[in-house]
């Protein structure tokens, strides 16, 4: 697998597609590893399209949609205390401004490979992803190392604090609590390059994707600061959890020397 942040939801898109396509239309539940809550995806029973091509495409769209929701939950879980490595807080990364845009791009890249027939098996998928990433970065007008460092210097004190060190949460000062899968990148003040809009479909061939499967977050014994739900958290609850995080960060975020 490849290391950039957008490849994690890309890999999840491929993984979910490989499970969804053979079972499309069946009722079943996929259980994933815990992230504070126990992560489950419940797939509803429905009559899938009669066309092989439409079944394939619907499976791919549903996989990309769910992979992005997994990425959204990861941001929420990080803020509420999830740690993939014991003793190392991940709060610094929660809702950082580039995360969900990059995650959405990863889901889109994987979706493109699947729809183009460039992910027939895991090896084929990995090879195809290696090829598509450079062209995607070119389209996004990725900048060379020196220009990137100059921007880091310009936004020091606005987006991040060079006086802090990992894992201090407020090394990152700028966060984006907007969760939707219709996104522009968050741009620094003064950036004039037109942003690239990314989105995922909500409907395909008359099927509302959100009605085909439900992402469920069930309580565990290790919820850290995550409130315990009455039954389980679902996608409809994500915005409230993110808004609570935003309000607390707004109160506790240190004042900076620029644009405060």
Name every feature range the model reports, one short phrase each.
Residues 90, 102-103:
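Long, domain-scale functional regions
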Residues 95-96:
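Hydrophobic/aromatic-rich structural module bridging two neighboring secondary-structure elements via a short loop
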Residues 75, 99, 105:
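Divalent metal-coordination and catalytic microenvironments
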Residues 1-92, 111-260:
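Bulky hydrophobic segments
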């Amino acid at each position: 697998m490849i290391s950039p942040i957008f490849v994690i939801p890309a890999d999840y898109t491929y993984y979910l597609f490989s499970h969804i396509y053979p079972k499309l239309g069946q009722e079943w539940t996929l259980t994933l590893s815990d992230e504070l809550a126990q992560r489950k995806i419940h797939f509803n029973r429905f009559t899938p399209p009669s066309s092989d091509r439409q079944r394939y495409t619907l499976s791919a769209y549903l996989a990309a949609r769910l992979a992005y929701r997994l990425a959204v939950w990861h941001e929420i879980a990080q803020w509420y205390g999830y740690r993939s490595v014991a003793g190392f807080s991940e709060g610094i990364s929660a809702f950082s401004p580039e995360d969900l845009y990059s995650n959405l791009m990863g889901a889109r890249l994987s979706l493109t490979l699947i729809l183009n027939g460039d992910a027939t098996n895991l090896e084929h998928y990995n090879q195809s992803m290696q090829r598509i990433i450079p062209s995607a970065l070119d389209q996004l007008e990725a900048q060379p190392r020196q220009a990137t460092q100059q921007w880091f210097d310009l936004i020091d004190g606005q987006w991040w604090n060079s006086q802090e060190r990992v894992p201090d949460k407020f090394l990152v000062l700028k966060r984006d609590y907007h969760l939707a899968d219709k996104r522009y990148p968050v741009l620094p003040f003064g950036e004039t390059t037109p942003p690239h809009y990314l989105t995922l479909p909500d409907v395909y061939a008359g099927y509302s994707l959100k009605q085909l499967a439900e992402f469920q977050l069930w309580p565990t014994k290790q919820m850290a600061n995550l409130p315990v739900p009455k039954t389980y958290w679902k996608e409809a609850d994500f915005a409230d959890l993110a808004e609570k995080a935003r309000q607390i960060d707004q109160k506790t975020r240190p004042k900076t020397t620029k644009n405060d």
